[in-house]
Amino acid sequence: MTRILDNDLIGDEGSVERTLRPQYLREYIGQDRVKDQLMIFIEAAKRREESLDHVLLFGPPGLGKTTMAFVIANELGVHLKQTSGPAIEKAGDLVAILNDLEPGDVLFIDEIHRMPMAVEEILYSAMEDFYIDIMIGAGDTSRSVHLELPPFTLIGATTRAGMLSNPLRARFGITGHMEYYQTADLTEIVERTADIFDMEIKHEAAYELARRSRGTPRIANRLLKRVRDYAQIMGDGMITTQITDKALTMLDVDQEGLDYVDQKILRTMIEVYQGGPVGLGTLSVNIAEERDTVEDMYEPYLIQKGFIMRTRTGRVVTEKAYQHLGYPYEKTIKT
């Protein structure tokens, strides 16, 4: 069953996000540190009439990495060509993409950490010196062909920056860490989305929805659609704080933005492992989830909210988690 709080795209959300996508940095809400840096770097590159240095955007899913890539291209006034790591299966696939670039273009590779190593190695010379050497033919008739490339900007996006090889990571001149959004920024995003889709929402309701959206715009916009449905059927269409709370409670999204899977993780750690420490692999088996899913989708928010700590011997539940779930806190828990 799909989680309402899943960070990844669900259904037609890709087209919805394109509708909501800001075009320029001044329209982009949140991520101020990344925006401020990019504003300087982009303006400097434009004044020198050079391509922007290659950019690596990393952080949890749903925080606007793809949107930021499009905004960068718009700010530069150039075209953006989009692909993803899993879509580039062979070296020839990447060569075809690179050979199609025009001077100054932006090449956006989502999930760049999932590129095969043979493909990644072609990027090294392309990023550093704007050329590639490829082998044509086979056996005794094979020969090396040198292809010059126009200056371009590669923007890579990843949720797993640690999985990038050192040679690839070193070739990005600009890195942007996309962080979970502040509630005030998410409130503004919710109100902007409501305005675009002609929804009526009280400011206090937008704040409540934002507060329970795990710091993620994608989740906030998804919850807004479900709260709107609830308001239309169970109310008069106006999204109020009371309507928002009832709708989110119905969706099993609690006051801290946790759903049943998050609570299952915490309850399992408390009831089965006495609060920990417990290894991630062991915990994943117990709750019947993939290890990578727990590490990428659930754990970051639980750590950010202070419900779980990472220690040398495993994950440990915090006193805050005990209190939130109504368990007596054991002072002897090992950390």
From Swiss-Prot:
Role description: The RuvA-RuvB-RuvC complex processes Holliday junction (HJ) DNA during genetic recombination and DNA repair, while the RuvA-RuvB complex plays an important role in the rescue of blocked DNA replication forks via replication fork reversal (RFR). RuvA specifically binds to HJ cruciform DNA, conferring on it an open structure. The RuvB hexamer acts as an ATP-dependent pump, pulling dsDNA into and through the RuvAB complex. RuvB forms 2 homohexamers on either side of HJ DNA bound by 1 or 2 RuvA tetramers; 4 subunits per hexamer contact DNA at a time.
Subunit structure: Homohexamer. Forms an RuvA(8)-RuvB(12)-Holliday junction (HJ) complex. HJ DNA is sandwiched between 2 RuvA tetramers; dsDNA enters through RuvA and exits via RuvB. An RuvB hexamer assembles on each DNA strand where it exits the tetramer. Each RuvB hexamer is contacted by two RuvA subunits (via domain III) on 2 adjacent RuvB subunits; this complex drives branch migration. In the full resolvosome a probable DNA-RuvA(4)-RuvB(12)-RuvC(2) complex forms which resolves the HJ.
Residues covered by region (Small ATPAse domain (RuvB-S)): 182-252
Listed transmembrane segments: none
Top-level EC class: hydrolase
Residues where Mg(2+) binds: T66
Classification via Gene3D superfamilies: 1.10.8.60, P-loop containing nucleotide triphosphate hydrolases, Winged helix-like DNA-binding domain superfamily/Winged helix DNA-binding domain
Catalytic reaction(s) noted: ATP + H2O = ADP + phosphate + H(+)
Provenance organism: Streptococcus equi subsp. zooepidemicus (strain H70)
Family as reported in the entry's similarity comment: Belongs to the RuvB family.
Region annotated Large ATPase domain (RuvB-L), chain positions: 1-181
Residues noted as binding ATP in the record, renumbered to the chain: L20, R21, G62, K65, T66, T67, E128, D129, F130, R171, Y181, R218
Domain comment (free text): Has 3 domains, the large (RuvB-L) and small ATPase (RuvB-S) domains and the C-terminal head (RuvB-H) domain. The head domain binds DNA, while the ATPase domains jointly bind ATP, ADP or are empty depending on the state of the subunit in the translocation cycle. During a single DNA translocation step the structure of each domain remains the same, but their relative positions change.
InterPro entries xref list: AAA+_ATPase, AAA_lid_4, DNA_helicase_Holl-junc_RuvB, P-loop_NTPase, RuvB-like_N, RuvB_C, WH-like_DNA-bd_sf, WH_DNA-bd_sf
E.C. number: 3.6.4.-
This protein's UniProt keywords: ATP-binding, Cytoplasm, DNA damage, DNA recombination, DNA repair, DNA-binding, Hydrolase, Nucleotide-binding
GO cellular component terms attached to this protein's record: cytoplasm; Holliday junction resolvase complex
Signal peptide from the UniProt entry: none
Protein name: Holliday junction branch migration complex subunit RuvB
Annotated spans, Head domain (RuvB-H): 255-335
Binding site for DNA: R291, R310, R312, R315
Location in the cell: Cytoplasm
HAMAP family assigned: DNA_HJ_migration_RuvB (MF_00016)
Keyword rRNA processing appears in the UniProt entry: no
